[in-house]
């Protein structure tokens, strides 16, 4: 009774009790979700991967591209689960961490996997019939193969949330504190790496799309190696005459101004001709009007060493988004230039 009373009055003991409750709750969630995750990994491995391999419906390179490191990820989960069931969280996660690179490899292959799936569904009748048949099994609960393939990447995000929470609610004098802290750090680093891979893949898709919109000799290789930020129509206000609509593509280092091809152009209808490239490292941006958020739109001024560009939009929200994106690009380029000068 005395011990219980002292615990109720001692803030340190109360805090430790809260940590322990959160730790137990998090560990239970990690265990239960790992069981479900392993079940889904096993279903895909059993009813898709291994049968396809045995039947030879897909050639080995296509099969490897479609599923990537799936079987190895499944094996890693099979190793981890018994430790979680026995409450040996630190030891289990310590043994699991060397397998985290499989998730980075899986992420790097994810775009090619989805492309391969769509291509095979379109051209391979045997594969299409097989996939439809297997997806109809009650074990998959209406999920399609394309919904199941991203499962490891979704689970990695869960790992990060749960393992970090487990480490944060473990007292430093706990036997598995060091193991859990290290595991949380490694899982978070892998999740960040996977996020960067995903961002790079999305950027590559944007660049391919933009490159397809640009035509003419000047357009070749314009998007190579760049980071896409945004695109849209803006009105260019000349010193004299009427404003002219132009399509703008903003990348991390340049602003590309393009003019649409004539609608009746025989070969290039719907594409754009590059008219100018403006380096963001040399840009000074200011908002001439449109600060108040009213309905009249606004005007941006972009000054370069040898040219001044006035861009107008009747949409106040769109202009604000352009101002924000341009500001980020300019700041990033000037910061990069400053670092380069400092390094030399």
Swiss-Prot record:
GO terms for biological process: positive regulation of cell migration. One of its GO terms (cellular component) is plasma membrane. Residues 227-331 form the PH domain. InterPro entries: ARHGEF39, DBL_dom_sf, DH_dom, PH-like_dom_sf, PH_domain. One of its GO terms (molecular function) is guanyl-nucleotide exchange factor activity. Promotes cell proliferation. This is Rho guanine nucleotide exchange factor 39.
